[in-house]
């Protein structure tokens, strides 16, 4: 089963360190940012330690590496041309790094229309993606399903379909299906996941889903908030998320946990992934999981 989490990539080891961290958590796949998600500072491709990283991945049986684009990219912005242009240029740069890392998909939040309205935002995203996807490259941009917080675009399957339909080289667009986001956007992940998948299939097509983000939610269905919770401790619940993780449709697709670190002490929070992965593999909810995470 391809199950992993977001892991860090830093220091001298970079990708090799990411693979070691993923292995420590008992993962078979993992997701990274190529640098800090909130800024444009990046090490050169030569400094990402890619060769040793791939050796470590082979050694630990890790595959289907996923890259996440930084949050600062907003190609839906129509009010500030410089923000749009930075997004286009930086996304192009990130795609080159994704290719060098050997990942097939880079996950992208479609963007926020910052008050101009969803239709204008969608047109701007299409314009940006058409600029980016002219370069010869076989990395896919995985548009993420969004919660609809603020002016986020991509809160409905229809909005995402509109983007895909407008992009010329849309064979290079895939989808990252986020359980927390779709729940927060109003879809019934908890009680009717197959119904949600059927709707997605009709509007976009299940074959587009290449990454799944597995997160519980701190909010009720339709809250449009986007606050992740540990598996089984939120409003989606363990049974529904366990069903998602073991679903036949996602058998060969990397499933990535982005659940929060646990603990009150901000300087000493503990990663939950090893414990959540063990629990999902056992298919049995553990109500004492957070205590076990804290005791590690």
UniProtKB/Swiss-Prot annotation:
GO terms for molecular function: deoxyribonuclease IV (phage-T4-induced) activity; DNA binding; DNA-(apurinic or apyrimidinic site) endonuclease activity; phosphoric diester hydrolase activity; zinc ion binding. Its EC number is 3.1.21.2. CDD domains: AP2Ec (cd00019). It catalyses: Endonucleolytic cleavage to 5'-phosphooligonucleotide end-products. Endonuclease IV plays a role in DNA repair. It cleaves phosphodiester bonds at apurinic or apyrimidinic (AP) sites, generating a 3'-hydroxyl group and a 5'-terminal sugar phosphate. Belongs to the AP endonuclease 2 family. Keywords: DNA damage, DNA repair, Endonuclease, Hydrolase, Metal-binding, Nuclease, Zinc. Zn(2+) 3 binds at residues 181, 226, 228. The gene is nfo. Signal peptide: none annotated. Binds 3 Zn(2+) ions. It holds the Pfam family AP_endonuc_2. Zn(2+) 1 binds at residues 68, 109, 144. Zn(2+) 2 binds at residues 144, 178, 213, 258. This is Probable endonuclease 4. SUPFAM superfamilies: Xylose isomerase-like. InterPro entries: AP_endonuc_2 (IPR001719), AP_endonuc_F2_Zn_BS (IPR018246), Xyl_isomerase-like_sf (IPR036237), Xyl_isomerase-like_TIM-brl (IPR013022). NCBIfam families: nfo, PRK01060.1-1.
């Amino acid at each position: 089963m391809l199950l992993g989490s977001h892991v860090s990539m830093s220091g001298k080891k970079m990708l090799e360190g990411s693979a070691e961290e993923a292995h420590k958590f008992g993962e078979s796949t993992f997701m990274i940012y190529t640098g800090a998600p909130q800024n444009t500072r990046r090490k050169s491709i030569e400094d990402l330690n890619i060769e040793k990283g791939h050796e470590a991945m082979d050694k630990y049986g890790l595959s289907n590496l996923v890259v996440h684009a930084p949050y600062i990219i907003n190609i839906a912005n129509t009010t500030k041309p410089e923000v749009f242009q930075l997004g286009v240029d930086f996304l192009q740069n990130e795609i080159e790094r994704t290719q060098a890392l050997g990942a097939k998909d880079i996950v992208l939040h479609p963007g926020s229309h910052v008050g101009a309205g969803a239709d204008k935002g969608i047109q701007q995203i299409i314009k940006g993606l058409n600029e980016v996807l002219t370069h010869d490259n076989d990395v896919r941009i995985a548009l993420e399903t969004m919660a609809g917080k603020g002016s986020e675009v991509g809160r409905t399957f229809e909005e995402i379909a509109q983007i895909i339909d407008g992009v010329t080289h849309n064979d290079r667009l895939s989808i990252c299906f986020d359980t927390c986001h779709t729940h927060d956007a109003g879809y019934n992940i908890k009680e009717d996941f197959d119904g949600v998948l059927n709707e997605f299939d009709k509007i976009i097509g299940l074959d587009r889903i290449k990454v799944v983000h597995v997160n519980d939610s701190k909010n009720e269905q339709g809250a449009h908030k986007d606050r992740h919770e540990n598996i089984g401790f939120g409003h989606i619940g363990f049974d529904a998320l366990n069903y998602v993780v073991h679903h036949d449709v996602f058998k060969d697709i990397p499933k990535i946990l982005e659940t929060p670190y646990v603990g009150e002490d901000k300087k000493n929070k503990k990663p939950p992934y090893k414990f959540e992965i063990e629990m999902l593999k056992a298919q049995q909810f553990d109500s004492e999981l957070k205590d076990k995470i804290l005791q590690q």
